[in-house]
């Protein structure tokens, strides 16, 4: 197995495809990247900017360049010894007419060869859904769409479809006779009964009466092909037949203003294997599993072996050919049986590097029995982010936040309220389906046959709302100790909350702990297990939508802590916890990813690094908040008897400005537009004053108008005059945090993952802002300049970079130096032990340090933090005037010569390493203890 040295995430889009990536191959290699980490590359919906909406799992996306350009890119990368880690999406595909497997299901229903591919309940409890797939994509009620003429019957080579703007739904072949026999006498009289074209049409109509069904699958498909081909020939060969078909379609499409004219189309729709509906119906009457709450992403039954092989054939072939060396599994928690899936995948790809997108709650551990290398790095992200938040000021920050809002805020209550909101408003249909499944089972169980739907659903809602993690992994293989503890915790609290439903809770608890009665039939036991497996698929979406996509936009105490996988009640983490996390990682998951920015993070890594600085100066932060609120009060509008923005949204706004404010003046106009777009997304996600399913445009416009007034005219603006000095101060200390964070990412157990463009400052907001095009030309230019100057005068280069940190070159330089060192001492970083080091002196809490050891090589990472109290704005934490007697005790057995892989500086110290001697030129250090004292560049040459 090839373990990456460092990965670089690329977001492929139609405007940045394989050719564009080929142009940066040499740059990635020079930077020190070992593997390109690609967003999904299989064929997605046309124009897709992310690739998670796959429509063909066995074709490389033509919009990215197709297979030919893909192989050219891979070959170019291999020339530079760069591998390929591929993001794959086993959970879902696009619900779209471009998805031919799904179209086949919509056209053929139970007779489709793909009927078991998608997670559809064909026997749904709502009669109108039985034997159909709900298609909740209409912008208003179905009847209104019908009578307004928005639903159009259309005929083309592939047959009849119902079109709703760009959406197309296939008409089942059995319904063709409705259309093609409409006023049949008209064409008979026109052509004559014996006309060959009319006779051919009659033969088609006779064939339509005897469409094979059931076991005669292949014959059915053959006959459909013949019928469609004959009809298309008639369309092309006979102007009279063409006019007849057009006439029939016009009749079916009706005339707005005449409701009765749509009866034919309504009857035709009633026969189909799909049920068109208003999009909001999807939240309540859904009969297929979605990705989270996204109606147009339909889930696969990937647990079915045939589905697995069909959807993975292309990727596994690329793995087996050696084209792809790593896989990243998207949304592992959505799968029916994640462990089974990973086992099956590993059987087909035994040597592939394998990581999963798994969101771990604080102190939650990854299942140790999964045959993978680890997670994609959100767990590391929250650990490294947390150590730059000063924990001791949590009570003070609570007070500041609540004083600004004028009310108390309890995050735990917000989590509970919003999970219940998501259950009632966005996942109601999913929970309803679970409750009906449970009711079916209880009806066949003598001790639960009297339980009502009301009681069972109330118990289910309580359990789901209380779930403390994204999901458990209980299966027929058993239950882990951790999962048993989670279940115990949930059930204990649920029984306290709703004691009137104790019997129902006890019944469900039997499922959750696999306490299945032996006297049950094998079929009943299988149903019990199925319910448990199904329930576990929905705790993740609830956590994601209730907390990650709601509470993290509502609880704004310190928004740098509101990140994927975080728990916003945790105000930073202790150094002790950080070291414990790293020690566990080194022993259990040494090859997991260390991420600091991804395509899904709420903020770019350097935006978070800035906002964390506020935790060091809470009193100053509150003074400025009051000042800004007073200055900006005249810019607020009143909507529904409240000033906009509300205090909570205004508090969020100022933090966002501090974090994302651009370094360069020429970026300012674009920044204002980005902030306004961000505001809309953030407040809709918060679901307090507006939301996606019911936008309040009055509130939204008032807030964006406020932002426009506050930020307009940067040269004559009272707010900016008050804001910019404080923002510049935060910016400076944020830079120092960022450099420390970069060092820790590259040296802690795991491998560093760099999100596209983040080798310079990453002040991105949430997607789609973080998927903006990356200027690789300037990065290539900067890197060449750094390499040239470093070879001539490394100390001079460092001084230059620290004088002009705004352009981001200092971060690029650090990244480059760290990745070169990582390549030279790869074994130490991949296999070395993790040693927590002791720091002595009055400033010991301001230093994060640890060692990596393997054989006779020791490497020490030194990253300062909490620097507002140590250096003035514009200064760097360098030399004796800052660090005084602060010192590190190196690992036992070290020699007395250390070499800084960042600056080339040599340090003496066998028993003690003084920070005043180490941090003389650069704010962070990477000390290498080796007999030789050659530079990293010399080491590289030796390695070659």
PLM regions: where:
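Helix C-cap/helix->beta junction micro-motif
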Residues: 80-81
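Active-site region of glycoside hydrolase catalytic domains
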Residues: 96-174
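Short, glycine/charge-rich beta-strand/loop segments that flank catalytic centers
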Residues: 88-95, 835
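Aromatic- and acidic-residue-enriched segments that line the glycan-binding/catalytic groove
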Residues: 48-56, 92-121, 369-378, 771
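Conserved short loop/turn motifs at secondary-structure junctions
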Residues: 91, 328-335, 803
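Carbohydrate-interacting/catalytic domains
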Residues: 1-46, 58-59, 63, 71, ...
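Alpha-helical transmembrane segments and their helix-helix packing motifs
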Residues: 94-95, 106, 402-405, 435-436
């Amino acid at each position: 197995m090839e373990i990456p040295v460092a990965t670089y995430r690329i977001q492929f889009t139609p405007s940045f495809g394989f050719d564009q990536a080929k142009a940066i191959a040499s740059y990635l290699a020079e930077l020190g990247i070992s593997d390109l980490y690609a967003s999904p590359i299989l064929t997605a919906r046309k124009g897709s900017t992310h690739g998670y909406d796959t429509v063909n799992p066995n074709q490389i996306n033509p919009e990215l360049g197709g297979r030919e350009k893909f192989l050219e890119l891979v070959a170019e990368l291999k020339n530079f010894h760069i591998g390929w880690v591929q993001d794959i999406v086993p959970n879902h595909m696009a619900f779209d007419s471009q998805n031919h497997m799904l179209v086949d299901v919509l056209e053929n229903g139970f007779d489709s060869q793909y009927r078991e591919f998608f997670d559809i309940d064909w026997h749904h409890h709502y009669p109108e859904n039985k034997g159909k797939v709900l298609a909740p994509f209409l912008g208003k009620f179905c009847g209104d769409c019908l009578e307004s003429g928005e639903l159009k019957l259309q005929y083309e080579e592939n047959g009849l479809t119902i079109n709703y703007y760009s959406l197309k739904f296939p008409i089942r072949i059995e319904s063709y006779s409705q259309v093609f026999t409409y006023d049949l006498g008209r064409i008979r009289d026109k052509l004559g009964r014996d006309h060959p074209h009319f006779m051919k049409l009659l033969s088609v109509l006779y064939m339509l009466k005897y469409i094979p069904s059931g076991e005669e699958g292949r014959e059915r498909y053959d006959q459909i092909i013949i019928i469609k081909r004959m009809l298309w020939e008639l369309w092309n060969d006979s102007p009279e037949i063409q006019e007849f078909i057009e006439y029939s379609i016009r009749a079916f499409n009706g005339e707005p203003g005449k409701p009765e004219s749509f009866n034919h189309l309504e009857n035709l729709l009633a026969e189909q294997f799909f049920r068109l509906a208003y999009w909001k119906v999807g939240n309540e009457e859904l009969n297929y599993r979605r990705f989270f709450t996204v109606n147009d992403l339909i889930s696969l039954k990937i647990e079915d072996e045939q589905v697995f092989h069909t959807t993975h054939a292309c990727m596994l072939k690329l793995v087996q050919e050696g084209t792809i060396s790593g896989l990243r599994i998207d949304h592992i928690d959505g799968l029916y049986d994640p462990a089974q899936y990973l086992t099956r995948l590993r059987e087909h790809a035994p040597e592939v590097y394998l990581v999963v997108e798994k969101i771990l709650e604080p102190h939650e551990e990854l299942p140790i029995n999964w045959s993978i290398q680890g997670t994609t790095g959100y767990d590391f992200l929250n650990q490294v982010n947390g150590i730059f938040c000063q924990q001791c000021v949590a009570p003070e920050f609570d007070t500041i936040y609540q004083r600004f809002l004028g009310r108390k805020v309890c995050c735990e209550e917000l989590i509970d309220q919003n999970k219940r909101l998501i259950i009632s408003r966005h996942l109601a249909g999913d929970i309803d389906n679970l409750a009906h499944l449970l009711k079916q089972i209880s009806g066949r169980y003598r001790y639960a046959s009297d339980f009502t739907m009301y009681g069972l659903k109330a118990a289910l809602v309580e359990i789901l709302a209380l779930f403390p993690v994204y999901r458990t992994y209980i299966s027929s293989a058993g239950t882990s100790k951790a999962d048993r503890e989670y279940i115990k915790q949930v059930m204990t609290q649920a029984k306290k909350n709703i004691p009137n439903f104790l019997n129902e809770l006890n019944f469900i608890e039997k499922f959750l702990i696999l306490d299945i009665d032996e006297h049950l039939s094998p079929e009943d036991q299988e149903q019990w297990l199925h319910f448990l497996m199904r329930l576990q698929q929905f705790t993740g979406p609830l956590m994601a939508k209730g907390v990650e996509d709601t509470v993290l936009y509502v609880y704004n105490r310190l928004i740098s802590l509101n990140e994927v996988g975080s728990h916003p009640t945790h105000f930073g983490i202790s150094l002790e916890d950080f070291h414990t996390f790293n020690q566990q990682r080194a022993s259990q998951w040494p090859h997991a990813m260390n991420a600091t920015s991804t395509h899904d993070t709420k903020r770019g890594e350097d935006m978070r690094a800035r906002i964390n600085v506020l935790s060091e100066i809470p009193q100053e932060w509150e003074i400025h908040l009051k000042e800004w609120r007073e200055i900006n009060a005249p810019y607020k509008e009143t909507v529904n008897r409240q000033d906009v923005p509300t205090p909570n949204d205004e508090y969020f706004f100022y933090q966002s400005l501090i974090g994302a404010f651009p370094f360069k003046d020429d970026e300012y106009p674009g920044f204002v537009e980005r902030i306004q777009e961000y505001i809309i997304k953030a407040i809709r996600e918060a679901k307090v004053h507006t939301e996606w399913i019911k936008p309040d445009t009055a509130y939204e416009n008032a807030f964006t108008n406020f932002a426009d007034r506050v930020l307009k005219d940067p040269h004559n603006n009272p707010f900016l005059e008050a804001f910019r000095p404080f923002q510049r101060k935060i910016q400076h200390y944020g830079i120092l945090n960022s450099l420390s964070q970069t060092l820790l990412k590259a040296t802690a157990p795991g491998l560093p993952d760099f999100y596209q463009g983040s080798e310079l400052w990453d002040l991105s907001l949430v997607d789609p802002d973080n998927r903006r095009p990356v200027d690789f030309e300037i990065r290539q230019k900067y890197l060449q300049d750094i390499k040239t100057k470093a070879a001539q005068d490394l100390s001079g280069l460092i001084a230059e970079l620290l004088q002009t940190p705004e352009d981001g070159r200092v971060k690029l330089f650090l990244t480059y130096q760290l990745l070169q060192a990582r390549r030279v001492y790869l074994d130490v970083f991949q296999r070395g032990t993790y040693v927590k080091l002791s720091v002595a002196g009055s400033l010991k809490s301001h230093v994060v340090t640890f060692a990596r050891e393997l054989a006779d090589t020791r490497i020490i990472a030194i990253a300062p933090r909490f620097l507002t109290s140590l250096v003035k704005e514009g200064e760097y934490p360098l030399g004796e005037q800052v660090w005084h007697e602060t010192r590190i005790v190196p690992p036992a057995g070290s020699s007395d010569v250390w070499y800084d892989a960042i600056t080339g500086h040599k340090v003496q110290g066998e028993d003690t390493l003084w920070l005043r001697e180490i941090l003389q030129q650069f704010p962070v250090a990477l000390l290498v203890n080796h007999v030789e004292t050659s530079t990293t560049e010399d080491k590289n040459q030796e390695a070659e």
